[in-house]
């Protein structure tokens, strides 16, 4: 039986905890399938069965590491680890037995140890510290574009040309605000979580009309287990709409499952992917999310966006014109968002969680796009997706500085570090969908 979790950190209980030793077999059995959830951080074993529901980063992201070593994701996601460890004391139930390795045999020890040395080097170099002027100017350029969009209609009227220009400017505002909220959501701007969360609410809530809690819930899972089926929500379109990855597509075919004609998915992707995700799904689901979970602060920030848009554009366009502008902007933004966010992951390895080490988890699911001033701006520096996934709290203006160090690490251990031109990255989304669709069809018909 599992030992009862210790609730109050006093000296006597601390001594008892030091005497409790566990094996990896015992830890692996507490993966959540039987309700109990344990995880390991720096050889210490924590019972997160009840705490997972109260976890500030979301219940699912921490549960995805139940039964596993979570040392590297713990370090990667938290900016004030000392404070977090104090709250973790009440969850501590023991540690790994002395004869047990520090992590599971599925993980590369030499690679993990060297990556941790790289992490320490990166911190000593100051690459985890943000240049606040960079983010201030980035915010100002978004606000200026927002004002320019309104001035275009106010000065030049609402005929086709100024209306179209306004829509393009507003789409740019929404896309760039999406990249900026991503920075604050990852706690990569300020040294305290409080300030990051506050500005995150402003950017994603007031500038975009979306809830911060929804983004945290979805995006942190993606970073914890990228391209892992049933753990990464970014691939939840498998198998309902798409057959993704070689492994999962063949599995689906062998099981004789056909929710869609997957062998044509590289064609209908252009209809239900880039143009539809935001206006036909996210736009409505986010309201369901905040109401269902009673996220009233998020709802207030979201409503402030709609109130602002209504009172600034309604006098110029009327209700029909405003609705037309709004959905054109969401349509354009959706295309921008989907192509950029999918180019780094969909063409890469997609599978079930194999519980490999942190570096392998991120590199097998992630690729980069070549650096240029335009690519950096257009993608919000997500063209450095590998560096971002390895160091999610690193300010984006430092990605190019750490990239050579990451490349050296990958070369030493024979890990493919893939970077490609922007248009090639876009095309690879379609090619990978075509390939996995064909693999599904072959397995469906012949296996």
UniProtKB/Swiss-Prot annotation:
Q: What turns on this gene?
A: Regulated by dietary vitamin A and exogenous retinoic acid in liver.
Give, as in the UniProt entry, the pathway in which the protein acts. Lipid metabolism; polyunsaturated fatty acid biosynthesis
The reply to whether Transmembrane figures as a keyword in the UniProt entry is yes
InterPro entries this protein is in? Cyt_B5-like_heme/steroid-bd, Cyt_B5-like_heme/steroid_sf, FA_desaturase_dom, Fatty_acid_desaturase
Under the GO molecular function aspect, what terms does this record hold?
A: acyl-CoA (8-3)-desaturase activity; acyl-CoA 6-desaturase activity; oxidoreductase activity; oxidoreductase activity, acting on paired donors, with oxidation of a pair of donors resulting in the reduction of molecular oxygen to two molecules of water
List-wise, which residues carry N-acetylmethionine?
A: 1
Q: Which residues lie on this side of the membrane: Lumenal?
A: 154-161, 290-308
Q: Which segments constitute the Cytochrome b5 heme-binding domain?
A: 19-97
One Gene Ontology term from the biological process aspect of the record: response to nutrient
Query: Would the keyword Membrane be found if you checked this record's keyword annotation?
Result: yes
Q: Where in the cell is it found?
A: Endoplasmic reticulum membrane; Mitochondrion
User: Where is it expressed, tissue-wise?
Assistant: Highly abundant in adrenal gland and mammary tissue and moderately in liver, kidney, lung, spleen, thymus, brain, and eye.
Q: Which PROSITE patterns match?
A: CYTOCHROME_B5_2
Domain of life from the UniProt record: Eukaryota
Name the chemical reaction catalysed here.
(8Z,11Z,14Z)-eicosatrienoyl-CoA + 2 Fe(II)-[cytochrome b5] + O2 + 2 H(+) = (5Z,8Z,11Z,14Z)-eicosatetraenoyl-CoA + 2 Fe(III)-[cytochrome b5] + 2 H2O; (8Z,11Z,14Z,17Z)-eicosatetraenoyl-CoA + 2 Fe(II)-[cytochrome b5] + O2 + 2 H(+) = (5Z,8Z,11Z,14Z,17Z)-eicosapentaenoyl-CoA + 2 Fe(III)-[cytochrome b5] + 2 H2O; (11E)-octadecenoyl-CoA + 2 Fe(II)-[cytochrome b5] + O2 + 2 H(+) = (5Z,11E)-octadecadienoyl-CoA + 2 Fe(III)-[cytochrome b5] + 2 H2O
From the record, give the transmembrane residue ranges. Answer: 133-153, 162-180, 269-289, 309-329
As annotated in the record, motif Histidine box-2 runs over 219-223
Q: What class of enzyme is it?
A: oxidoreductase
Membrane-side (Cytoplasmic) residue stretches: 1-132, 181-268, 330-447
Q: Which UniProt keywords apply?
A: Acetylation, Electron transport, Endoplasmic reticulum, Fatty acid biosynthesis, Fatty acid metabolism, Lipid biosynthesis, Lipid metabolism, Membrane, Mitochondrion, Oxidoreductase, Transmembrane, Transmembrane helix, Transport
Q: What does this protein do?
A: Acts as a front-end fatty acyl-coenzyme A (CoA) desaturase that introduces a cis double bond at carbon 5 located between a preexisting double bond and the carboxyl end of the fatty acyl chain. Involved in biosynthesis of highly unsaturated fatty acids (HUFA) from the essential polyunsaturated fatty acids (PUFA) linoleic acid (LA) (18:2n-6) and alpha-linolenic acid (ALA) (18:3n-3) precursors. Specifically, desaturates dihomo-gamma-linoleoate (DGLA) (20:3n-6) and eicosatetraenoate (ETA) (20:4n-3) to generate arachidonate (AA) (20:4n-6) and eicosapentaenoate (EPA) (20:5n-3), respectively.
* Comment field on protein domains: The histidine box domains may contain the active site and/or be involved in metal ion binding.
Q: What is this protein called?
A: Acyl-CoA (8-3)-desaturase
Q: Which organism is it from?
A: Rattus norvegicus (Rat)
Name of the gene encoding the protein in the UniProt record = Fads1
């Amino acid at each position: 039986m599992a030992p009862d979790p210790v609730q109050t950190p006093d000296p006597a209980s601390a001594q008892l905890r030091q005497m409790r030793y566990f094996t990896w077999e015992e830890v692996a059995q507490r993966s959540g399938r039987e309700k109990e959830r344990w995880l390991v951080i720096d050889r210490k074993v924590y019972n997160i069965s009840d705490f997972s529901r109260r976890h500030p980063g979301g219940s699912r992201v921490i549960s995805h590491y139940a039964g596993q070593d979570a040392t590297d994701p713990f370090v990667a996601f938290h900016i004030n680890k000392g404070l977090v460890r104090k709250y973790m004391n009440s969850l501590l139930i023991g540690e790994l037995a002395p004869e047990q390795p520090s992590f599971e045999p599925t993980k590369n020890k030499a690679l993990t140890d060297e990556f941790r040395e790289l992490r320490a080097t990166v911190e000593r170099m100051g690459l985890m510290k943000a240049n606040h002027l960079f983010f201030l100017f980035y915010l100002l350029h978004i606000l200026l574009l927002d004002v320019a969009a309104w001035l275009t209609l106010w000065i030049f009227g609402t005929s086709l040309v100024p209306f179209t220009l306004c829509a393009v400017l507003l789409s740019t505002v929404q896309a760039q605000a999406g990249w900026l909220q991503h920075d604050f959501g990852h706690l990569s701007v300020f040294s305290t979580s409080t300030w990051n969360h506050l500005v995150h609410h402003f950017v994603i809530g007031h500038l975009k009309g979306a809830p911060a809690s929804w983004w945290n819930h979805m995006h942190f899972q993606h970073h914890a287990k990228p391209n892992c089926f049933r753990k990464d929500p970014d691939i939840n379109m498998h198998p309902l709409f798409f057959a993704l990855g070689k492994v999962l597509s063949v599995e689906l075919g062998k099981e004789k499952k056909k929710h869609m004609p997957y062998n044509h998915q590289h064609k209908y992707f252009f209809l239900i992917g880039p143009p539809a995700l935001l206006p036909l799904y996210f736009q409505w689901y986010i309201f369901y999310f905040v109401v269902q979970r009673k996220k009233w602060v998020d709802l207030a920030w979201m409503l402030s966006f709609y109130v602002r848009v209504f009172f600034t554009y309604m006098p110029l366009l009327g209700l029909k014109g405003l609705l037309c502008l709004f959905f054109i902007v969401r349509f354009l933004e959706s295309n921008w968002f989907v192509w950029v966010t999918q180019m780094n992951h969909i063409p890469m390895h997609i599978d079930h969680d194999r519980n490999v080490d942190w570096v392998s988890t991120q590199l097998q699911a992630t690729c980069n796009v070549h650096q240029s001033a335009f690519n950096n701006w257009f993608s919000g520096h997500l063209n450095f997706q590998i560096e971002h996934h390895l160091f999610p709290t690193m300010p984006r203006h430092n990605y190019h500085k750490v990239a050579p160090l990451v490349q050296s690490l990958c070369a030493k251990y024979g890990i493919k570090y893939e970077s490609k031109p922007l248009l090639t990255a876009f095309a690879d989304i379609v090619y990978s969908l075509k390939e996995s669709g064909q693999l599904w069809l072959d397995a469906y018909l012949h296996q």
